[in-house]
Every structure is written in structure tokens, then in C-alpha cells.
Amino acid sequence: MEDRYGREIRSFRLSITPKCNLKCFYCHKEGRNEEHGKLMSADEIGKIVKSSLEFGVRKIKISGGEPLLRTDLPEIIENIKDDQIKDISLTTNGILLEKYAQKLKDAGLDRVNVSLDTLDPEQYKQITAGGNIESVKKGIEKAIEVGLTPLKVNFLAMDCTINQLPAIMDYCRKIGAILQVIEFIPMEEELKHHHIDVVPIEEEIGKKADQVFTRKFMQNRKKYIVDGLEVEFVRPMDNTEFCGHCTRIRLTYDGYLKPCLLRDDNLVDVANPLRNGEDIRKYFIKCIEEREPFCKAQ
């Protein structure tokens, strides 16, 4: 199904918990800055995802909070699996990944994205309020070992981390990971000074690239191959290309469909209607009808 702007719905991002075992100073909590309603069960998540298939969803991204804190995560993945779904991936901080990688693979998870903003152990502790970077590295190694690949490293480009980019690139190249350089979206006034313009950085990477591809169904973002390393840039801020080619809807941990990454004022309740025995397809239609590019071309 397409929205009013001709954008197909192909991807569904599921936040399955607000809880996290780190406390990164920049975290936007998927747009839900306070704990709200009841957490969805594994069965409810499965039913909502199965309903989404009718509207064109073919890729699932699981996130949190930290999704590995849910002990029923393997069950959630098993409930999501369907022949129509081409890809189930998960975004994690990696702290618990070494422990659970094999179980997730066995349940049907295809691949993981791991957040890693620095390779400096002390800086990592500062950013995450006490996290152990060695646990993350071991988790990455285990994920690759069991086949949760292609593994992507999510690097958040900020004023305090950008000097780590060359080292992160070398690390990803060494382990065979894809690197995603993500623009920081400051959700609070006191964090705005951490934002940096990643356009010049992307342009510099582009000059060094051996090959450049365009990902049509991922906001038309570019993919650069630099000395064997695959690098992508995710630039949501003031980006008409990002918004104009968005194919994703989202589900909050408490059961609301979220039409737009950058808005929290047009959520559509789907969990409570499901619990009341309603046909939830009309709520997907409402969500899709609510979709519009946050940044529109002039």
C-alpha cells in the first residue's frame, strides 16, 4: 500500500521495550521519553506484524530500549517469522549479544545492528554511563560467528565522537561489518551543541569511494565502498530525500503505530483494539493515511 505521497510501505520498526542496561546521554528513546502504557506481549506483537503484511511490509527491525532485555525475545522472533518477510533484523547495544546470539539465530533472526560510537574504553564508559566496550566487541564477534550477518555498526556522529570515525572504519573493515554513520538528532535543547553537519563528511567519503550505489527503498541513501568497506550515511534532519523516500512505519513498545520517525503527535493505538477483539487493519490504514514527509521539497 502507498501513502498519499506515493511512498510504499515496506518496513516495520518495532520497539519492544523502553528499558535499557545503558544510559547513553543522547538517547531519544524512540520518541517515547516517558514510560506509558502496558508492554505488548510476544503474541500481540506477532499478530500486529502479521496484519502489517497485507499492507506491503516485508522487512522487520526490532529495537528498544535494549531488546535483549526481553527474555521472550526468541519467542517474539518466532511469532514474527513468515514466508512473506524477507528480513528480520535487530538493533542492540551489544552488551548481552555474546550470551544470546545463538538463541536469536536459532529463533530466526537474520542480522543485527550494533551501536558503537567510540573504540576508546573510557569514552565509551562516559557516553553510556558505565558500559564495558569489551562486552560489545565480544558480542559482535559472536554474532558474526553464528551468522547474524551482514552485521552493521551504527556510529552516531557527534562533536565528541567524530574523531573516532577513522578508527571505527578500520575496525569495521577488519571484522567485515558494514558501517552506518548516523546524524545525531538532538531532541533536547541542551544537546544541540553535540550536533554536527555530516554532509561534508559524506562528501569526503564519496571522493574516496571505489563504488557508489543508491538504496532506492531506504530513503534513496547512498552506499559507498571504500577500500573494501561498505559505508552508509543516515541523515534524517532537514533531509527531503530521507523523508520523501521513507518506506517505514513504526510500533511503540506500548502498542501505538507511529507514522513518522520525527513526530510523536499522530500516534495510532493498535494494541488496545487488538485486545478488544477488533479487526486492526483499519488502524494500519489510518496510520498510512496520516503519513506525510516531515521535510518536504519546496
From Swiss-Prot:
PROSITE patterns: RADICAL_SAM
Amino acids binding GTP: R13, K61, T91, K152, R248, I249, R250
KW Metal-binding (keyword) present: yes
Recorded metabolic or biological pathway in which this protein acts: Cofactor biosynthesis; molybdopterin biosynthesis
The keyword Metal-binding is annotated on this UniProt entry: yes
Summary of the function given for this chain in its UniProt record: Catalyzes the cyclization of GTP to (8S)-3',8-cyclo-7,8-dihydroguanosine 5'-triphosphate.
The protein's name in its UniProt record: Probable GTP 3',8-cyclase
